[in-house]
Amino acid sequence: MSTGSSSTSEITEISTFKGQEQALRAGRLGTAGLLLSVLAASAPLMVVAGVMPTIFGLMGIVGQPILYVILAVVLALFSVGYAEMSRHVHNAGAFYAYIARGLGATAGASASFVALVAYSAMQVGIYGIFGFEVSNLFATYLSTELAWWIPALAAVAVVGVLSWLKIDLNAKVLGVLLLIECLLVIIFDVAAVADPAKEGLSLHAFNPDTLTGAGFGTALCFCIAAFVGFEQAPVYAEETSSPQIVVRRVMFLAIGFVALFFALSSWALTIAAGPSAINAQAGKLGPGLLFGLSEGVLGKSFTDVLHVLFVTGMFAAMLSFHNVVARYAFAMGREGLLPAAFGRTNKSSGAPGTGSLLQTVIALVVVIAFAVTDHKPTGDPTAPVLHLFTWMGNIGALGIILLMAAASVAVIAFFVQRGAGRAQVWRLVASGLACLALLTIAVLTVKDFDVLVGAGPGSVLSWLLPGIIGLTLVGGLVYGLVLRSARPDVHARIGLGNEAFQLDKAAEAAAAGTANM
């Protein structure tokens, strides 16, 4: 396998010799299907309606569009090396497989559990805000009080069923929901620009001076969560028709789309409210900012539809993250990091059924736990939004930032160890710069974690919640060391995926040939 060039031989299918039950079905996804699947995780409408008002209102950052551009540059630098790595390693456990190849199997074992916890936390957290918003819809349009956990548990069941189906069917469901919500946001953006507030078409939001203040670091941490999803593309490499081409293309398309879409949408919000008034309005209305501005320029009927799509967009994100967790569990089961049952797929759909069931059970337990401890009246956002959604979302975001930083180092090590450092020098420089930027963001995230989760200064949550990722990281390292000592055969397979099975196949063939001599 050449590592000094970006050219690779054509691979028509990736499977294992142990049968299709231990292989994800190849050829299920093309560029469009994969792009829609990873973009669904970014939940465009949830970001515009939920994240952006928080940054405007609580952190006082008017120049939010600049933040998305800055992060796009950082993540594009990260993707230069990450995408090249995806041409050489096709594994549903993308992050941990890359880290294992570059930094060793023990580091890969640790990364696998960090990835599992991080993506699971992000997925489960969305059930909170989903249940809360569905409850609001019932109260608004049906005058019916509904506890948030009822629609949340219903969503757990529906997502669990859909995840057992073929991934191309999942992509179609995600694609339809994503396209509709993006279209509605674009309509709002155009309407806001066409009918601006009294300050007119101001470009004040693109002025770097608007980034000054104590809220900059925290705002950067909030914004990076909007990009989460693009890095999932290699997770589906085994299910794409041409992974060497499709995965790389989708990552850069996703980063470009997210940066442009969110930069323009956050600017449109400042135009609709006025740059001088946006922070005050966002602080007063919160997630209602978008809907209030929308009703003013597009009317109540459009805004009602926007409310519904806000909910379906969250559902799409839950399904997207669920699929990723299931595939990480599959990859870990296939390589012995989890019980072998997780490394098998459904015979009918080719989906990682046991991994999907694992995430369904985790979501069920967490939602029930938050529901049981919620003693607030119906309609109160404390448990579902301020706790479940905010806590879990920030735990997940921190884990993913650290994984990206580690993967950047792994990319450098991977190519240098193979004597391809000179041929890949610019990609390695890009990875190094990305690592420094991502570590800076990680430090800011931990430093401001009390602000991110809405806790007071000195709150136990400021170290307890990020400590979950730290504990997982250390626990994974210990587990990796135990495997190296007690089960060296399993340790040697970490990160190899299908290649480990192909090596076994070659060894068995060689042994059979020797026996027949």
Q: Each PLM stretch: what is its role?
A:
Residues 15-21, 25-135, 233, 447-457, ...:
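Transmembrane helix-boundary motif of multi-pass solute transporters/channels
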Residues 16, 20-25, 64-65, 141-147, ...:
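Helix-loop-helix junctions that connect adjacent transmembrane segments
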Residues 29, 148-198, 228, 249-259, ...:
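Membrane-interface loop-to-helix entry segments
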Residues 51, 393-403, 425-517:
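A generic transmembrane alpha-helix motif of multi-pass inner-membrane proteins
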Residues 54-64, 136-148, 168-177, 354, ...:
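Transmembrane helix-loop boundary segments of multi-pass membrane transporters
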Residues 91, 114-129, 232-239, 300-340, ...:
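Membrane-helix boundary/coupling elements in multi-pass transport proteins
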